Every structure is written in C-alpha cells, then in structure tokens.
UniProtKB/Swiss-Prot annotation:
Designated gene of the protein: yomE
Gene3D superfamilies registered for this protein in UniProt: Single-stranded right-handed beta-helix, Pectin lyase-like
Domain of life: Bacteria
Name of the protein this chain belongs to: SPbeta prophage-derived uncharacterized protein YomE
Amino acid sequence: MAGFYRYDQNLDKYVPMPVELLASEGEEYTAPKITQKFNEVETKTTEILNKVLTDDRYFTVTSSFKQDATLGIEYYVTKVTPKTTEAKKSMVQKTFAYDFEKSIDPTSSYFGTTNRETVLSMAKRKRSVVAINASGWRSNGEVMGLQIKDGVLYKDYDAAGYTGAEACVFFDDGTMKVYGNREVDADILISKGARNSFAFGIWLVKDSKPRTAQMTTWADLNVKHPRQAIGQRSDGTLVIITVDGRSLRSSGITAYDMPSLFLSEGCINAFLLDGGGSSQTAVEGKYINNISDGIERAVVDTLTISYPDDDTDSRFFEVQEGRGLATSLNRRVEFIESKPTWNVLDLGFSPDGLIDNTAKFKKALSDLSEKGGGKLHFPKGTYLIGKQNTTSASEKIELPSNVSIVGERRSYTKLLRNPNHSLDELLRITDHNYIEGIEIDGNSSVNKSSCRLIAGGNIKSFKMKDCSLVNATDRGVSIHGIGKSITIEGMYISNIANECINVAEGEIIKLIDSEITFSGTALWVGNAANIFTKNNLAKSLKTFVRYKNSQNAICSGNIITNNIDRAIWGSVREAVFSDNVFKQCHSDYHLYFIQEDTGTNDLIVTGNSVYSDVEGTAFIRTPSDIDRRRVSGNVGNIPSLNLD
C-alpha cells in the first residue's frame, strides 16, 4: 500500500491516493530559477498539491511556492476559498495551546504560562486542514493583545500606550477586519458579532488601501525576517502568505514590503501575524515552509481551518512512516510502497552480549536492500557486532538506502562493539537511514583501536533520535563527504575521544535537544550551510561547536559549561547566537571568531548569559575587519559582553 491516503466515504475507509497525483519514489525537484516577473514562479510540486487539496463541498485549498527576485524572497501562498455561506462562517477557528484551553479563566485579567504547543500538534488535535501560528507572546508565555475565542473575551487589549499588538478579528459572518490597538472597544466588537481574534500586528491592508503610516511600532518592522500574514478577498477567500527568511535562498521581508503582496492577491484586508521562527504553515498535517529555526517552534495559539464537526470526509490524515509530501512543498515528493519490519530475534540474533551477530546483521541488511528498504527492530538486549581480526572493507556493516534500525529505547537496547574489532568504522550509513532508541557503545575500555561509531561519505537524509553514542576511540558520527539533511536529536553522547558529530561539508545540519558530556568537540562542520544547534546541554567538552567556512547558523537555547577550550569558535557568516548560557570556559574567550578562507561576518550575539570564575576569560572576540556585527543584550560577570 502507498503512504498517502484519503478517506473514502462510500467505502468507509482510508484509501491510497491515485498514483498520478504523486511523484514516483525518489523523484526530486530543483528550485526553479528566479525571474524578474513578480509573483509568477511555481513548482511542479505546487501543481500536485493543488490537485490533492481540492474539496468542492466546503472549500478549496491551494498552496503555491513563489519567488520574487526583486525582494530576494521565497514564499508560500495558501488560499482557502469557501464554497458555501456556512463554510465562510465556520471554517476559521482559534485554538489555544493545551494549558490555555484546560485551565484559563476567561474572566481573569491575565493569562499566560510558559507552556506552549506546536502548530502541528494543535492541527492534529483539531483535525484541521490548515493551521498557522497567529498571536504574539511574551517570554513568560503571556499571549499579547485582544483575545476573543468563540465570542468570549479572554483578554482585552494591552495597556493603553502599548500600540504594538493590534487586532485581526473574524466575525460571525466570516468577515475578517483589522484594527489598531484600542481602535474599537472589545465589548463593542463582541456586540457586533466578533467571534475570534488574533493579536500581533501591524495591520497591512485596510479597505483595499495599504498601510503607509505608523509603520514604526516595533523596531523590527523595517528589518528583513521570516514573516507570516493573512488577508481576505471580498469573496471570503483567505490568503495566507508565509515568507522564508534567514537563509541563503530567502533573506526574509520587511513589514513595509508585505502590503504589496496582499494587494497583488486581491485582498481588501490583511494583517501581520507573529513571525520569525514562529512563521509556520501546516497543510494537511505537514509543514509547507522552511522553518527558520530548523525545528518547529511551540506557540501560544493558532488560526485553524477545519471542516464542519459532523464531517468525516477529506480530513487530514496520518502519513505512513512520516512519508508523503515533504515538509517543504519545495524540493521532494515521495510515493513509497510499504516496507517490511523484521524482529532480529526472529532472524536468530543473540541479545546476550556474548555471541557475535555480525554475519546475521549483514545478511538481514542485504535482504532488506533487495526489498527496497525496511526496518530492523532490536528488542531489549545487548547485541555484539563488528567483524573481528580483519581490516577488509568488505566486512563493514553498511545500512543500505531506506533502511532503519530501531530499538526498545536507548537504556534497553545496545549495539556493543566486539573487543577484537579492528575496522575503522562500526556502522556505515548511506542515504535515508534512520536510527532510534538504541545505545551504540564503542567499548573503548576494552577495544583501544581507533574506530568511528557511525560513518558515511556523501549522505542524503540521516537521522538519529533518542539514541546514545558512548565510549568511542575516535568520532561518534563522521560524514567525510557531503552531508545533506543530517539530524541528531534527543541524544545522550558521552566519552567520545574526538568530535561527537563531524560533517566535512553539507547543508541542513541539526544537533538539538541532546546531552553531550566528557567528549571532544560536540559538532564540527566545514563548508556547511544552515546549521542548527538548539536546546542542548553540553558539559565538560573541549569545544561545543567548531565552524569552518560555514554560513547560516542558529545557535540558541543551549547550556554550555566547563569547556576545556573555547565554547564556540571558527569562521561563520550570517549567524545568530542567542539565549544561550555559557559557564566556566577555561580559555581566553567563550566565543572566538576568525576569518579563515571565507571569512566571518553578519553576526548577531544577543540575549546570552555568561558567567565564569576563571581569571582573564572574556566573552567574545571577532575579527577587526568583520562586516556587520551586533553584540548586545547579553548579561553576566565577564568582559566584552556587549560590544555594540
């Protein structure tokens, strides 16, 4: 069976989508060339989506990928056209994050918690066809501005004089209107039928006229960022525009340039929603835009588009094995036959940690390769692997393309390196490999020969999640060719002699939500683009991240403590380092940037907390000839916290 389904009301079951609506397995699309003609470039993937998402009974949904050479942006236009008056009235809904819906008293003067929820999670809870981030929120989780849900006032406008959070209001008849802060009192809006409201702003278009004044409410309005906004045509069609940003392909857009996009789409009203890393649009259970954080961001509320409550047809569906339309409607569409899942105990593997499983492992992988891929499931136990007493490359354990290995969880399932294994790699990866719930132990206390736990050459799409990498005599993961889309998530990494993750060259590299301790460098990247290190705990390392001739990096939310050397160093362009905690660096600087071959420029270093008892340690050193640097808003007890 294929991996893409829709509900068939006559058959009362989910059925595969017709093959002609989807690309063949492995088909890839390159981004179209940018043209000077405004608003005209669309990909073949767009055409596929337009066919998939049409439903003539309630509304139609189309999503288009576009480029604008003059503005230097890539963006997505999602249009929702109601087919009936009732659909126009009911299709827009407001969804608060979990805790808001469970515990908030709408009569209270304040509501906010640090708990938030992802756009996709809210979409799945509400079975929404389209879901987008909406209102802005403060660091304590308090939602901004006027908040009306289902005709009930949850929160009034922000204090008089605070003009940032304006209002986008949907009325009982489905009409969308936009207002400045406190332009119309909340009780008057509700008396006129206000049903749901969203707050951020500014409004961009009102009564078919673009905003030309009071565009300085917030300083960032005239700065290029990823942006999310919504508009409405006179016929009730909603137009959602999501602009990518903070990347080589798309620089982002200012608020000043947004009205023209909506006027070109025929909108009579338009409103700027929360943007930046919060800019996220999910259509039929998948994000269609490139999220600038590299991972989805939890938010306080969403604007969702759903079918009527009594309808069971054409709702969004679960995509089998995480496949189907790609997370960006831009690059790749897959149509995949179901792959087998084999329990290794059924194949004669021994989980006692004493008997070598190398031959059986290689045989199982070879058989899965002949079937086009699949999954090996490792129940609880310790599995000894690694050919002993040989240096022959043919004896390496290689995961074929489209093969996954999955354990019970990392504290239950272990792959243990043989004491007499002498090859320089324990596992070799190829394209589209996935490893989850397994501890991979290099057995360095017994086997002293140099060995990388996982290695590969030119790799497309490799992910490790909820695994452990421990006791390696060399690197943890080593990509010595070009690595594209490498994700290391939710890991425990310890006692790795050299780099925990090393990518010689590549793009879209993520180290997120992991704990890394007592090792060399957590992440080493060279000639790489789009590098994300977020929400990691790094303790007692040599270095957290070493960049070499890299660009487009986001490093945020990490706690980095007790490094032997500098926490972050190297050469990187167009990088943001924010909201990290740096403690006890045993070197001259926590952050140390150099020029190397391609140089260091366009750095933003802000919102970090920096503390050290080591005498002589400063926060940051940048090259004297750096272009565009902002080091501000940092706190701590050492010199050079704020250079600008």
